[in-house]
Amino acid sequence: MVMLDHPLAVTMGDPSGIGPEIIAKMYLRRPDKRNWIVVGDPLVMEHAIANLGVAVQIRRIATVEEAGCEDGVLNVLASSSLATLPAVGRVSAVSGQAAYDAIVTAIGLARQGTIRGIVTAPIHKEALAAAGIHYPGHTEILAEQGGAQHVAMMLANDEIRTVLVTIHCSLADAIRKADFPAQMQAIRLAHEGARALGIVQPRIAVAGLNPHAGEGGLFGDEEIRIITPAIAAARAEGIDATGPWPGDTVFMQARLGKFDVVVAQYHDQGLIPVKFMGLEKGVNITLGLPFVRTSPDHGTAFDIAGRGIADSSSLETAFDYATRLKVPTPFFSGAMS
């Protein structure tokens, strides 16, 4: 048996959702790429395999060093040990805790350097809350537990990439939080994230916050007071940032090849264009961590969980991105002024 060398870890996600199923399907569909382990609950993964009716054995491992590459064997490092399976397609504290335990375990492995990075299957925010775990989402867990000071979300597919200035908060809060430091953080991380994807001199487009990028102050002055000065400061650092560009047209220009990355001001401004082009194509990359992290661009899909019809394409794309990404440099991992 060939032992795995510095593998990626795939966290199982919420056990009541489609995460375990799409992980099992990825294993079956990608026999050529198996330098990875699952971090999660062995019972959950055994059930996911059995539900697909395939002959795959779960190898329970206690350390990454025990993982080997062998046909028909899926390595699972136990982050929890459930006595019974949680109900499929329902929010539960048990599922929330198990999902959280998998993430924290994988973060520990990444910080120790025993794995190359993490690919996370979807979690359910209500399940986390039910378990008494109060994080808005994966990004915030990874930032705090991963010891990162500055993080940002990059959503990417084959045609466009976007980085968010603000992430999981209300629109009212996003307007308040989109200040000068937040602009600088997003622009810097967009630049370094694109470089991690192999783009040597990234062209960064910064979207405006208001309609028509404020129309010269007629529809709001954040572009004048905050965004334009941040772009100028980024350019002084050698970053090719331009804007602010109207949010309703900048993604089309990026898709046509004018820009490599769009810095979007708030969650839906950035995610709608990427997701409109197909959930199976989109990947979430967390910038600013001291290790690689990607995830599929969809949720737990409770409505189809346990039915064997979930599509693993987005998870596979996330895995491919994780293998392509360069291991973060000190600047990329948040060591910024």
UniProtKB/Swiss-Prot annotation:
GO terms for cellular component: cytoplasm. Signal peptide: none annotated. GO terms for biological process: pyridoxine biosynthetic process. Its EC number is 1.1.1.262. The keyword Cytoplasm applies. It comes from the Bacteria. The keyword NADP applies. Substrate binds at H138, T139, K275, N284, R293. Its cofactor is Zn(2+); Mg(2+); Co(2+). Pathway: Cofactor biosynthesis; pyridoxine 5'-phosphate biosynthesis; pyridoxine 5'-phosphate from D-erythrose 4-phosphate: step 4/5. It is found in: Cytoplasm. It is an enzyme of class 1 (oxidoreductase). A divalent metal cation binds at H168, H212, H267. Keywords: Cobalt, Cytoplasm, Magnesium, Metal-binding, NAD, NADP, Oxidoreductase, Pyridoxine biosynthesis, Zinc. It catalyses: 4-(phosphooxy)-L-threonine + NAD(+) = 3-amino-2-oxopropyl phosphate + CO2 + NADH. Catalyzes the NAD(P)-dependent oxidation of 4-(phosphooxy)-L-threonine (HTP) into 2-amino-3-oxo-4-(phosphooxy)butyric acid which spontaneously decarboxylates to form 3-amino-2-oxopropyl phosphate (AHAP). Homodimer. This is 4-hydroxythreonine-4-phosphate dehydrogenase. The lineage of its organism: Bacteria, Pseudomonadati, Pseudomonadota, Alphaproteobacteria, Hyphomicrobiales.
